[in-house]
UniProtKB/Swiss-Prot annotation:
EC numbers, comma separated: 3.1.3.16
Subcellular location field: Nucleus
Family matches, as PANTHER family: DULLARD PROTEIN PHOSPHATASE (PTHR12210)
Encoding gene (name): fcpA
Active site location: D142 (4-aspartylphosphate intermediate), D144 (proton donor)
Protein name: Probable C-terminal domain small phosphatase
Any GO BP annotation: hyperosmotic response
Taxon lineage: Eukaryota, Amoebozoa, Evosea, Eumycetozoa, Dictyostelia
A GO MF label: metal ion binding
Amino acid sequence: MNSSPITQVSNPNDSLNHSSTNLIPSSHNSLNNYPQKSVKGNRKKKGSIINKLFCCFVPSNDQNNGNNINTDNGASNNDKLQQQKQYNQQQQQQYNQHQQQQQQQQQQQQYINKDSSQQNGEIPLMVPMIPRHVGLKTLVLDLDETLVHSSFKPVHNPDFIVPVEIEGTIHQVYVVKRPFVDDFLRAIAEKFEIVVFTASLAKYADPVLDFLDTGRVIHYRLFRESCHNHKGNYVKDLSRLGRDLKSTIIVDNSPSSYLFHPENAIPIDSWFDDKDDRELLDLLPLLDDLIKVEDVRLVLDESRNN
């Protein structure tokens, strides 16, 4: 396990990660940009089988028991074929809707079973929601390479410098904010219960958040000691937050961080120094959409699997 106070991914352009000090260890690579929602392809295949079944079926007529499709009020064969086509389409739509409802119900039951299996009687990491947050979804944000990038190596024009004690020696940590992070925090301030959950140590992350959160919009701060040690990875177990998982979202650049709850995750690219980065702004429309859904996992998990 890492002994460094900072947990972050490797910057391919930063030779400091390979220095003898070994103060900034590497982690997993980030995922690609958040995928767009799409309809699963296997439903079309199921529909084609139903079409084949329905193509040979014509609704019966009370007068001729469906044996004659050419003598109903003088309608032409083309009219009858068109009616049959419309009927088949209606049946197909009803079948697709039924299949989708069944799939969602099965998926929700899987989530319920998963949630129940992870409840082990531990005291939640957070106290119950305060009254003004009741009804809001919980947004869990990573810190390093998601909101900021920190380095023990001096950087040009850092946003702030944090002194950190390591083995009796004070080291200066140079912190740069991701583009638009201030706008991002302001935009979500009243829409979510906001939690920063980092695998870094509190002695580094706490003062960083003091500088970053000038508007005091972050409601909880969770650090490395709140992570779960799983096969050498710091995993952020969302089931320990004391919040309903269907209303919990995590934004993180490291897939290992949300290993237990990938269906709750919005992956974000790791940020180091790209001044043109707009990832945080690009997240806002998606977050606004998730506010409106009952179970965020149904949206995020479907997008992740397509």
